[in-house]
């Protein structure tokens, strides 16, 4: 039996109900006034829910049953690589020698963990074609910012203080211009051509002596490989700029092509995506950054090194940009990524890309008769459709996404990239079977037919979820972020 009207945990609360008993205090009691200034001490007790352990278990178990994740269903969220995360990763991450160590331990006592991190760096160097890697950044956008700070340090060390502009394509991830801004750069947009690739003539127009870097995803966010990448690298390098690789779409080229061989100077990776660290719930992530030799002096300190005496962190880095994270990255995610890489091997990683690309092209060809296909060519790991023909019939891409919820599917990414009208971006990943793909495709075809025959069904969706249509404008402008007790009912 499912309770469709799930109470808030505060509404389950009963005064005086206790979930846990705490042990008797066995240390000296300290008054808060002796530790904190009065401004930081509550005048009244916090209004926390008073519930039993059973209440807590039932409440959060019921809520968890409403969630959708990779383990519960198909998750074709474009540009997010929502692949299945092998559970062997979790087993290894829970080894006592990994799970129970502390980052402040003496290096001599954690040599095994340091060896794993060093070996992971070596694997990532081989995969990307870079000269070295740091595991310190905590996530993708954090890696972007770190890479841009390295580029900034490089230019400033060479006296190029006028290189203040970073070029990004009009199909770029939103984090690219955001990271550039946070790193102190001005963002310049380069246009895509009619084939969905960077327009070389427009690139030549915007590149100049103020260019610090060009940020690219390859394949790009339209799922298309930038086939002119070598010429693009030459254009940027001849102008004195650096080429930055956003590793969001690395799943499309594993063991097939390497960013370093394409001419990229800096690369960030998303271990929580490509290399199966769990993601989608807000963290933690891991966004290692790889660089070519001329950027090594500026890597954040410390760097992990191997000597004849074992592994150690080198803090003697006078030109480093400093730390970008306490300690040395999100170790647990790095353990999971290392486990995945070692279990797959080079042939397995090559197969990852082959099946990811095959799945995406299969889905694209089956759906093309029912939705507009902006770029009718082979895609890589993901592809974009357009809901333009459905919009002409009064149904938006947003409606299509909400209708998919009725069938138990997480919707694809919608309205991104921004250069495709009514965009629907689908990434199936390599871990899904043909049967799963066909099930999703059949529902997308059904929705396309409903738009033509009974559009109200789609316009009013979802119909089967606990929460129906939200007032998205009010949710954005006047969000309710704190629980407030309802006013007493006057009798």
Swiss-Prot record:
Keyword Oxidoreductase applies: yes
Gene3D superfamilies with a match to the protein in the record: 6.20.440.10, Aspartate Aminotransferase, domain 1, Type I PLP-dependent aspartate aminotransferase-like (Major domain)
Oxidoreductase is among the record's keywords: yes
Q: Which UniProt keywords apply?
A: Oxidoreductase, Pyridoxal phosphate
Subunit architecture: The glycine cleavage system is composed of four proteins: P, T, L and H. In this organism, the P 'protein' is a heterodimer of two subunits.
What GO molecular function terms would the record report?
glycine binding; glycine dehydrogenase (decarboxylating) activity; pyridoxal phosphate binding
Cofactor(s) for this protein?
Answer: pyridoxal 5'-phosphate
Function, in words: The glycine cleavage system catalyzes the degradation of glycine. The P protein binds the alpha-amino group of glycine through its pyridoxal phosphate cofactor; CO(2) is released and the remaining methylamine moiety is then transferred to the lipoamide cofactor of the H protein.
Report what the protein is called.
Answer: Probable glycine dehydrogenase (decarboxylating) subunit 2
Question: What does the entry give for GO biological process?
Answer: glycine decarboxylation via glycine cleavage system
Q: Which domain of life is it from?
A: Bacteria
Q: Which reaction does it catalyse?
A: N(6)-[(R)-lipoyl]-L-lysyl-[glycine-cleavage complex H protein] + glycine + H(+) = N(6)-[(R)-S(8)-aminomethyldihydrolipoyl]-L-lysyl-[glycine-cleavage complex H protein] + CO2
The protein's gene is named gcvPB
Q: What class of enzyme is it?
A: oxidoreductase
- Coiled-coil regions, chain positions: none
Q: Which residues carry this modification: N6-(pyridoxal phosphate)lysine?
A: 273
What cellular-component terms does GO give this entry?
Answer: cytosol; glycine cleavage complex
EC number in record: 1.4.4.2
**Record's family?**
Belongs to the GcvP family. C-terminal subunit subfamily.
